Structure formats: C-alpha cells, structure tokens
C-alpha cells in the first residue's frame, strides 16, 4: 500500500477514535478503587444533617400554656410601680372567669411566640437562607465499579468541587443547628420573663378604695361592692364586667379546683384544665359585715378571716360570663 494512503488512514482513524471518546453517547468503565475518595466525600455530604423540628422537652415551661389569658384588656398602668401591661382572664370552668394575675401585676405582651416562630426570627436576624443538599450521584453510578458517560466522568473528576460543596453545606448545617439550639434558649428565657407577672403579689388596696391610699370610699359602701365602680377598684380600673370576687366565688374556687402548693404560691387548676397562679397573700373579697371585711388567707391554709377596712390586701379580679 502506498505510504501516503497508509498515513492518511491512520490520521483518519485516530480522529474517529478521539471523536468517539468525547461523545456523550459513549460510555467508559470505572474500576473499584478509582473513585474511593470521591465516594467518601459524597457519603459525608449525604450524612450531613441539622434538626428538623422541636420536641416537647424543648419547652421547659409547658404549664404556661394553660395559664395564658384567653382575652386581654387594653394596656393599663399599675399604680404601685407604674408598669404598663395587660390584664387577662382564664376560664377555669367556674361561674366566673378569674384574672390571670393580681391587680397591679400586668403581662408585658398579649401574644407569645412559638418555638418555630422564635427560630424563624433568629434565622432572619442571622440571614440564614434555605439551601438544598448537593447531589452528585444517581442510581446508575452511585456505586463502583460502574459505567458512566464521558461527560459524567469529567464532572466526577473535579474533587475540588466536591470539597467545596461539602464545606458549604457543612457550614450551613452547623449554622442551622446553632440557630436551633439558640432558639430553644431564647424561647425559654422569653417565656420565663413574660410570665413572671403571674407570680407577683401586685398592689395592695384598702377595701372600698379606688387607690392604694384611698380610705374614703368605705364610708357609704354597700355590704357587697362587687361591680360598683364607686367602690370596687377592679371595676374602676378594668372596666365593666370586671369586679372583686365575692365570698361565694372564692368558696367555689376553693371547693371545685385542685390546689397545689409551692414555696410561696399556689397553682389552681379548674374543671376546664386551665390554671391560675395565686401568690401566697391576703386577698379581699367584695363583702363586709358592717364593721369588718371578709378576707381570704392564702398561706399554709385556705380560709376566710375578718379584717379591717384599711388593710392593704391583694385583689384577684374576676370577669363575669
């Protein structure tokens, strides 16, 4: 054969081989050990994760949910310390609804954020954006030995891209995990701060007075001042529908609810399953005898006692249904 024709045939054949190797339609075989390092990185990426939700144990004070008011008043300013906040009531399943706190102790908020809302708030502050987990394999070539296209082979050779993807997603998972843990801490701290008002004794008032040092209101007070805005400070401050509890309403609370004593307060749970906190203190009822006032003594026992009009005692308002 003529040497010129032989050389031309070799050139043409080489070109055809090169073209066939670079075609996407052709496949190459990859052995067992060729992609050990690459597969290890992919396995590490697939193993990366972050918390996907919250558990019941993440809420350190679940009892607060049963104590949160169902309805709040407009913002009020307490007389004793001049603190602004809100009063609200809880339906214990009795003839009246009981305020969640004593007069003079107010909630700083009317809405409590959930754990999920706290996490979203924190992620917004940190600028965390959603990121999908990188994918470098499919069912066809996820294990080795395998056959893959030449284009897939070239992509798979970029170990640096794999490392970069791993680092980005690993940082994302660590940031998400940190935000999740910080959200739990923030949520519980906020819950504690927002519910401290439940345990406060509040302001002390003389019976029949509309201010902490108003002793003049008792001169012409009726035997029961409940709902009378001239003498009932709960009605005067909170408005229509609110009043000091009568002796009978206190008795109903004592008889029909479960009382659990702690160091300096009671948790009182009604037939509805809802609860209120009653700090250990003396409490006024709305009733008098003509010479003395019926009070409720809540310390080591729960009992009615007679006292003077000028005694500065706590008031736990009620709301009529």
Regions found by a protein language model. Give the residues of each.
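Positively charged n-region of N-terminal signal peptides that target proteins for export
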Residues: 1-5
């Amino acid at each position: 054969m003529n040497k010129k024709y032989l050389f031309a045939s070799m050139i043409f054949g080489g070109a055809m081989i090169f073209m066939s190797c670079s075609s996407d339609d052709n496949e190459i075989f990859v052995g067992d050990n060729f992609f050990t390092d690459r597969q290890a990185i992919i396995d590490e990426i697939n193993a990366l994760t972050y918390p996907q939700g919250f558990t019941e144990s993440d809420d350190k004070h679940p009892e607060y949910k049963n104590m949160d008011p169902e309805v709040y008043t407009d913002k009020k300013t307490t007389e004793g310390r001049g603190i602004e906040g809100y009063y609200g009531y809880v339906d214990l399943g009795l003839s009246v609804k009981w305020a969640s706190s004593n007069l003079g102790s107010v909630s700083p908020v009317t809405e409590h954020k959930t754990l999920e809302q706290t996490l979203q708030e924190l992620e917004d502050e940190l600028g965390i954006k959603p990121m999908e987990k990188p994918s470098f394999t499919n069912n066809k070539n996820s294990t080795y030995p395998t056959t893959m296209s030449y284009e897939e082979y070239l992509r798979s050779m970029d170990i640096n891209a794999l490392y970069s993807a791993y680092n980005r997603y690993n940082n994302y998972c660590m940031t998400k995990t940190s935000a999740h843990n910080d959200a739990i801490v923030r949520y519980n701290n906020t819950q504690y701060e927002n519910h401290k008002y439940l345990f406060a004794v509040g302001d002390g008032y003389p019976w029949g007075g509309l201010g902490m040092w108003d002793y003049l209101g008792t001169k012409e007070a009726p035997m029961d001042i409940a709902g009378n805005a001239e003498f009932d400070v709960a009605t005067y401050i909170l408005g229509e529908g609110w009043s000091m509890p009568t002796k009978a309403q206190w008795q109903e609370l004592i008889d029909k609810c479960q009382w659990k004593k702690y160091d300096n307060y009671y948790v009182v749970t009604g037939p509805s399953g809802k609860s209120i906190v009653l700090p250990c203190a003396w409490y006024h009822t709305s009733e008098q005898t003509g010479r003395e006032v019926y009070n409720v003594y809540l310390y080591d026992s729960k009992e009615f006692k007679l006292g003077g009009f000028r005694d500065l005692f706590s008031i736990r308002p009620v709301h009529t249904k």
